[in-house]
Curated annotation (Swiss-Prot):
BP term (GO), one: one-carbon metabolic process
UniProt name for this protein: GTP cyclohydrolase 1
The protein's annotated pathway: Cofactor biosynthesis; 7,8-dihydroneopterin triphosphate biosynthesis; 7,8-dihydroneopterin triphosphate from GTP: step 1/1
Highest classification ranks of the organism: Bacteria, Pseudomonadati, Pseudomonadota, Alphaproteobacteria, Hyphomicrobiales
GO molecular function, one term: GTP cyclohydrolase I activity
């Protein structure tokens, strides 16, 4: 695995390897939402907010479902019948949504993933989309999300090289603070032949931006 990716993964996943604190009950989570509603200055007992704590907790189960998923389950099977394919596999424009770990507000965009398969075979295309969701459905930074996705691919598929680019708009920048709507953040990471050969990076970017080239 690429040393840069490994270093970032060690920092971003260290908290996941520690013993998890006891998870509050559903009732405790709903009570916490009610406290926040009162903190905003609103009345949780009014009709429009009466069921909001339950709805928020249910939504959080979906938003953060990645904590209950394992990348190894998604990447454990490859298609050996395409053994011998040695060119790039690229999946473009994979939509994702995540939540910033600093403000717990959404960021969303698309992921582009390219890799050169190893002799073991190729992964199902839908598996790459599922992999993105596993890590996106957690509290994240875009940089860590980028590293975690490519790190999982490197670890489980051991490709000859992998390239990833994430493009996202962050609501913590659009809705608060500087409030710059429409601003995009791009992150990239390369391993193997992509890291060692700038021409492969150019090819990856070209296929992402102009797939007919």
């Amino acid at each position: 695995m690429d040393d840069v990716v490994k270093s970032l993964l060690q920092r971003t996943t260290s908290s996941l390897t520690k013993p998890a604190p006891a998870r509050p009950s559903r009732e405790e989570a709903e009570a916490a939402v009610e406290v926040l509603l009162r903190w905003t200055g609103d009345d949780p007992s009014r009709e429009g907010l009466r069921d909001t704590p339950k709805r928020v907790v249910k939504a959080f189960e979906e938003f953060f479902s990645g904590y209950n998923a394992d990348a190894s389950d998604v990447l454990s099977r490859v298609f050996e019948e395409v053994h011998g394919y040695d060119n790039m596999v690229l999946v473009r424009d994979i939509p994702f949504s995540s939540h910033c770990e600093h403000h717990m507000v959404p960021f969303f965009g698309v992921a582009h993933i390219g890799y050169y398969p190893s002799e073991a075979g190729v992964i199902g295309l839908s598996k790459l989309a599922r992999l993105v969701d596993i890590f996106a459905k957690r509290l994240q930074t875009q940089e860590a999300l980028t590293a975690q996705i490519i790190g999982a691919i490197d670890e489980h598929l051991q490709p000859r090289g992998c390239a990833i680019m994430l493009e996202a708009e962050h609501m913590c920048m659009s809705m608060r603070g500087v409030q710059k709507h429409g601003t995009s953040t791009l992150t990239t990471q390369f391993t193997g032949v992509f890291k060692n050969d700038p021409a492969e990076q150019v090819r990856f970017f070209g296929m992402v931006r102009n797939p007919k080239s």
